[in-house]
Amino acid sequence: MSGSTVPAGAVVPEAHTIETFQPPREMLQNHPSKPHLANFEEYQKLYKQSITEPNVFWAERARELLSWSKDFQTVHSGSLANGDNAWFVEGELNASYNCVDRHAHKDPNRVAIIYEADEPGQGRNVTYGELLREVSKLAHVLTNLGVRKGDTVAIYLPMIPEAIVAMLACTRIGAIHSVVFAGFSSDSLRDRVVDAQSKVVITTDEGKRGGKLIGTKKIVDEALQQCPDVRNVLVYKRTGADISMTPGRDLWWHEEVEKYPAYYTPVAMASEDPLFLLYTSGSTGKPKGVAHSTGGYLLGAAMTGKYVFDIHDGDRYFCGGDVGWITGHTYVLYAPLLLGVSTVVFEGTPAYPNFSRYWDIIEEHKVTQFYVAPTALRLLKRAGDHHVRNEMKHLRVLGSVGEPIAAEVWKWYYDVVGKGRAQICDTYWQTETGSNVITPLAGVTPTKPGSASFPFFGIEPALVDPVTGEEIHGNDVEGVLAFKQPWPSMARTVWGAHKRYMETYLHVYKGYYFTGDGAARDHEGFYWIRGRVDDVVNVSGHRLSTAEIEAALIEHHSIAEAAVVGVADELTGQAVNAFVAVKEGTQINDALRKEFVLQVRRSIGPFAAPKAIYIVPDLPKTRSGKIMRRILRKIVAGEEDQLGDITTLSDPSVVAKIIDVVHAQRQ
């Protein structure tokens, strides 16, 4: 324990009462070798070097973890203030060579991809040797379709091995992959194809997810009605559905790859050449195509895979993220394959055909690292512990990604899923950071439930006063989270809009990278992420983090999920409105709502008490699991006609149900 009395004015009160967990003894005892660092002191020493001598630190790591066809001399040039950062400047390398060839040459029969299809038992394994052949053949196809170095290719594929093959085939020929999540609407797809100027789109006849069919090709056809510059659509046959094929434009993947040899010489890329574009949410305004470089991004992926997740030879890594998001890019594809281990590609959902699906996959494939969003964990915790019937004794690391994980969900993950044998790594990062930036290192870092713990190598956090723009020093402080130094895997620009990149990330506080998130540093130096700066409610001069109020609400035994938004209030400036989904079998009445308000009063204080609590069947979420608080804000503000594109939600029908609840309660 960190001590059970909370000093007056403590910025992170929970840090004083919550238990600090050391890396589990059983994890270290049963380790196939040992963690890459001896102890926390070694992390501190290396971390210090990464901040004071970044060029020495990163040059050594880049040469150790990546294979360069041409060495670099200049480790880093540019600055945050100027937005012209470049790493390993003269170096040349190829991403697909680093992810595939070098492992295939050593051991072609080593499994690269463990494909777990939507229907259990229908998956297959792909070895590094097979992956090299498949990537090479598709590289020939793309070249034959006129795709050249520096061109973008749009990939609209579900979670199947071909998504990995397509991404790597692009990198092999020097093309830039632009993956669009295969759940986005045709309008969202169109916007991304147009913005990236992609001439080729890769998709499937259909997708399968959670027992349902998704008409991916149909969506592509709709999107392309307004994309005259697209020359070809390459279609992978996933279900064999009867689909329309446009002659001269549409081609079958299986027919095209048969025409070409099983090897394609990888194209040498400059370290700073763009590797991929990934569009961050276009739910407000035009989507931003975040552009990542080749050398720096690959190093960030390999470094965090090695040190955060303790990846060792022979591991089997399972990230539940989708390649349509940054989590799937970095931790389904790049980190595991750069390190030459097996990565699980899971097509389905955690609830299909039942709530044991994740645990069955982990058990069957002897998974060593598992990485998933708190949304999925809340769903599975809500479903009941009896679903977690597997031993899963090979698990060493349990990662969490996408949003802060509430303490009780953290403990459930640790006790029920990990059985106290696996370390929890609550990782903080963003599409723009490329890889984990504040995170524990498995087997090394002490952890506190709810805290992302300490910065990764090369990341120098600063908490900035949002009013003065000055850095706030010392511990037991909070502010806006920014970074003081560039790091290799940071995004280099917004595609075709460098000014927007500068204004969004680098000019908010000159000389800093601005994350847009609030954070606190507790009395022991642990970092606590407090949610988006715009997810702050100001009630009677009290700045309240919505994440904090949500965490207080879900401490109540009846609440499965909660989302909090601020709504304009004549008296207090803003008032707290809460939307909660309750566990099955809960009796809904006014007494229960009062209990929920009391829960927040007790946990945070009377000023944080929600003015209204809406009990809803579910919350509006994107398919990556993020709660769309923007939609809830519009509903409570009576702006239901300005909700924007809700087709990107995992279940758009939930919006009408929420509106009904709000109307009924206000009458």
UniProtKB/Swiss-Prot annotation:
It comes from the Eukaryota. It catalyses: acetate + ATP + CoA = acetyl-CoA + AMP + diphosphate. Keywords: ATP-binding, Ligase, Nucleotide-binding. It is an enzyme of class 6 (ligase). One of its GO terms (cellular component) is nucleus. InterPro entries: Ac_CoA_lig, ACAS_N, AMP-bd_C, AMP-bd_C_sf, AMP-binding_CS, AMP-dep_synth/lig_dom, ANL_N_sf. One of its GO terms (molecular function) is acetate-CoA ligase activity. One of its GO terms (biological process) is acetyl-CoA biosynthetic process from acetate. SUPFAM superfamilies: Acetyl-CoA synthetase-like (SSF56801). It holds the Pfam family ACAS_N. ATP binds at residues 402-404, 426-431, 517, 532, 543. The keyword Ligase applies. Its EC number is 6.2.1.1. NCBIfam families: Ac_CoA_lig_AcsA, PRK00174.1. This is Acetyl-coenzyme A synthetase. It comes from Neurospora crassa (strain ATCC 24698 / 74-OR23-1A / CBS 708.71 / DSM 1257 / FGSC 987).
